[in-house]
């Protein structure tokens, strides 16, 4: 049987391999099936294959597609984590693994740029990220507005603002990372079906049964990393989830373009009184990328997402550029939409299905999950194999009473 997913162009769909699924229906039993091959799913697929498990991954589109939450050319990794200090050890280990993955990848996966966080007086983001950094003894450099403007002249912020720089931050290339994990997992013996949607997951006495287009696959365990499609597959999740439409834009700098290049501009978060933004330097001619991190317009479901960015969406991002990065407020290069799958408290959801512990659920990363993919892959592989995870995940439970305190408000 042929492995799929080797060196896939970012926008090339792969047809489902019907001969493979036909064989599965007749004779194949898997140790684990992974549903959804985005950030967490691709890393889990790789990790299980590395361990020698009989693993199958099923992706309804293709690895690196633009219809979910694992695309957009770049993702931030930052260690000074305002969301909660408990993420920092996970991030430190994830970063080490991203560096290792980059060394073995034909495509660039990770670039160190440092990360800078900037905010208005009293911004919760600044206070909590500093607290997390100090607790975990991260290298961090605090700055007043004058130093921010001098060191990173792309920013023109008010005199009473403050910020800090953390040198270990950087940008990840999501499509390349997903392809790398899929490629490596397939080379280790993992199987992949693309262009095929899982219709049902059924619990049986001796196995879990999946239906795909009228055919059935049996497995000892399932990992559902389906992002915004999670509740379509596992309906008894008690934690309410909200899917939101998010828009990102790429811009050609108006003046002094070298100030916006990777090496001059780090990846950044900026907390303004009326919004919170994130962005990336110009890397390989992509332009300055920026977006709001505040959850956007709710969607009725995952299939409601369209690549339909509007002039109004552009205006929202230009508000950042006009006020705080005026030299970057040049011609629009392109815009793109994606989805956040949000929990009420802004933290992840990692747990077992209430009705069947053989079904592991991991999704709802609330817009900040991609950077954790290498660690999520190990955690989910452990859970799928009925092992105790190497990293603690109790704070990400579907039980609201066990979860971490809510992520601090950004505005």
What spans do the regions from the language model cover?
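Beta1/beta-strand and adjacent pyrophosphate-binding region of the FAD-binding site
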Residues: 27-38
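N-terminal Rossmann-fold NAD(P) dinucleotide-binding loop
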Residues: 41-42
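Active-site substrate-recognition segment that forms the wall
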Residues: 46-50, 107-111, 221, 228-357
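Glycine-rich FAD pyrophosphate-binding loop
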Residues: 50-69
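Dinucleotide-binding Rossmann-like beta1-alpha1 core, especially the glycine-rich loop
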Residues: 74-151, 160-161, 276
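Short beta-strand to alpha-helix junction loop
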Residues: 89, 117-124, 165-183, 308-313
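Helical element adjacent to the flavin cofactor pocket in flavoenzyme catalytic cores
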Residues: 167-220
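C-terminal catalytic lobe of FAD-dependent flavoproteins
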Residues: 319-411
């Amino acid at each position: 049987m042929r492995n799929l997913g080797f060196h896939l162009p970012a926008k090339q769909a792969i047809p489902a391999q019907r001969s493979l699924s036909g064989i599965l229906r007749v004779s194949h039993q898997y140790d684990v099936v992974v549903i959804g091959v985005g950030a967490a799913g691709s890393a889990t697929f790789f990790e299980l294959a590395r361990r020698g498990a009989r693993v199958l991954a099923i992706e309804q589109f293709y690895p690196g597609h633009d219809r979910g939450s694992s695309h957009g050319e770049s993702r931030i990794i930052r260690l000074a984590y305002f969301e909660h200090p408990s993420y920092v050890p996970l991030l430190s280990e994830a970063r080490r693994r991203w560096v290792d993955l980059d060394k073995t990848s034909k495509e660039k996966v990770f670039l160190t740029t440092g990360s800078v966080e900037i905010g208005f007086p009293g911004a919760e983001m600044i206070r909590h990220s500093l607290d997390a950094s100090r607790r975990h003894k991260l290298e961090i450099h605090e700055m007043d507005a004058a130093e921010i403007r001098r060191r990173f002249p792309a920013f023109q912020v008010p005199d009473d603002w403050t910020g800090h720089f953390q040198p270990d931050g950087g940008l990840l290339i999501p499509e390349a990372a997903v392809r790398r994990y899929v490629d490596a997992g397939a080379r280790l013996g993992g199987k992949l079906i693309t262009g095929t949607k899982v219709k049902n997951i059924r619990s049986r006495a001796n196995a879990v049964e999946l239906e795909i287009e009228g055919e059935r696959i049996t497995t000892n365990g399932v990992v559902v990393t389906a992002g915004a499609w999670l509740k379509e597959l596992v309906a008894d999740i008690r934690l309410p989830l909200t899917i939101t439409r998010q828009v990102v834009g790429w811009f050609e700098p108006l003046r002094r373009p070298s100030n916006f290049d990777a090496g001059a501009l780090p990846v950044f978060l900026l907390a303004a009184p009326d919004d919170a933004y994130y962005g990336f330097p110009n890397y390989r001619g992509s332009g300055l990328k920026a977006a709001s991190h505040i959850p956007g317009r709710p969607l009725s479901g995952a299939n409601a997402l369209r690549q339909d960015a509007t002039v109004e969406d552009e205006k929202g991002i230009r508000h950042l550029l006009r006020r705080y990065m005026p030299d970057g407020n040049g011609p629009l290069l392109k815009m793109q939409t994606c989805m956040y799958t949000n929990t009420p408290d802004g933290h992840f959801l990692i747990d077992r299905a209430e009705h069947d512990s053989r079904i592991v659920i991991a999704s709802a990363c609330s817009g900040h999950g991609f950077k954790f993919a290498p660690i999520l892959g190990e955690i989910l592989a452990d859970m799928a194999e009925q092992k105790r995870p190497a990293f603690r995940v109790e704070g990400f439970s579907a039980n609201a009473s066990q979860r971490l305190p809510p992520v601090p408000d950004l505005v």
